[in-house]
Amino acid sequence: MIKKIGVLTSGGDAPGMNAAIRGVVRTALSEKLEVFGIYDGYLGLYENRMTLLDRYSVSDMINRGGTFLGSARFPGFYKNEIRTIAVNNLNKRNIDALVVIGGDGSYIGAQKLTKMGIPCISIPGTIDNDVAGTDYTIGYFTALETVVEAIDRLRDTSSSHQRISIVEVMGRYCGDLTLAAAIAGGCEFIVLPEIHYKKEELVSEIQAGIEKGKKHAIVAITEYICDVEKLAKYIEKKTNRETRATILGHIQRGGAPVVYDRILASRMGAYAVELLIEGYKGKCVGIQNEKMVFNDITDALKNMKRVFKKDWLITAKKLY
């Protein structure tokens, strides 16, 4: 029977992480458990930086972006000797289990800790929406709002100057955020990691639009596919139309979480604690068809490539 749990946020931050921490803390306290907040993810766990949390520790946190516990990427956690120190730090405080909030890298850490005797439950927190076992991740919908707002603003100035605008969106190797934002923002062209990309074909499509009388256009592209500044110069040279690239960058991770992310994070935080109380370990929570679900972390890590929303792309192309 667990009496003390720890909670940490790891990897890239996402709007709604504070709401998830709040869900963990308030649910645990309602079940008479003690909760320790661990600062800066696995790095703080290794450095033994943690503090006891009460219900007031998470007051006024549900609407705040970022994570008040802090987050960090800590590649050293892959080393067994580093994890052994982390486990010893937990044992010294008699912390029985952990809730880990983050993306696939955070899942790997939770998987390894579980194998070392620390029961872990993972919560998907990333704007990329690239984690298996869930329809949506915490932060995705807030980032989507941010991206669409940026696209709306770009459309205003692109229209004024009859310009082609390229907007680079986060997502790593998953195009969910780009695709949804492109549909909501009315983008004329979409470049995703899930589809074959040739700049020559993109230029041909843009040129065809110009010949039909299109005065401006917005191209939404997922990060890491190409150098968007070079792509902008290439398009401008081939079309003789002013072209500018905008990299949204880390602004996509900031801001107060939207309503859906607050609810999702609260539900996931509470559910993670419930699973620990029931004796589960090495699991990751998710939402599927609006219901809370859980899967083995190991299975999720084996199937991280999400099913591509091909029907969404087909719809988007009809709306160009």
From Swiss-Prot:
Subcellular location: Cytoplasm
Binding site residues for ADP: 22-26, 55-60, 155, 186-188, 212, 214-216
Catalytic activity: beta-D-fructose 6-phosphate + ATP = beta-D-fructose 1,6-bisphosphate + ADP + H(+)
Keyword Kinase: yes
List of residues binding Mg(2+): D104
Pathway: Carbohydrate degradation; glycolysis; D-glyceraldehyde 3-phosphate and glycerone phosphate from D-glucose: step 3/4
GO cellular component, one term: 6-phosphofructokinase complex
List of residues binding ATP: G12, R73, F74, G103, D104, G105, S106
Record-annotated active site: D128 (proton acceptor)
Entry GO MF terms: 6-phosphofructokinase activity; AMP binding; ATP binding; fructose-6-phosphate binding; identical protein binding; metal ion binding; monosaccharide binding
Cofactors, names only: Mg(2+)
GO biological process: canonical glycolysis; fructose 1,6-bisphosphate metabolic process; fructose 6-phosphate metabolic process
E.C. code: 2.7.1.11
UniProt family annotation: Belongs to the phosphofructokinase type A (PFKA) family. ATP-dependent PFK group I subfamily. Prokaryotic clade 'B1' sub-subfamily.
Entry function: Catalyzes the phosphorylation of D-fructose 6-phosphate to fructose 1,6-bisphosphate by ATP, the first committing step of glycolysis.
HAMAP family noted in UniProt: Phosphofructokinase_I_B1
NCBIfam families registered for this protein in UniProt: PFKA_ATP (TIGR02482), PRK03202.1 (NF002872)
Protein's name according to its UniProt entry: ATP-dependent 6-phosphofructokinase
Lineage: Bacteria, Pseudomonadati, Pseudomonadota, Gammaproteobacteria, Enterobacterales
Designated gene of the protein: pfkA
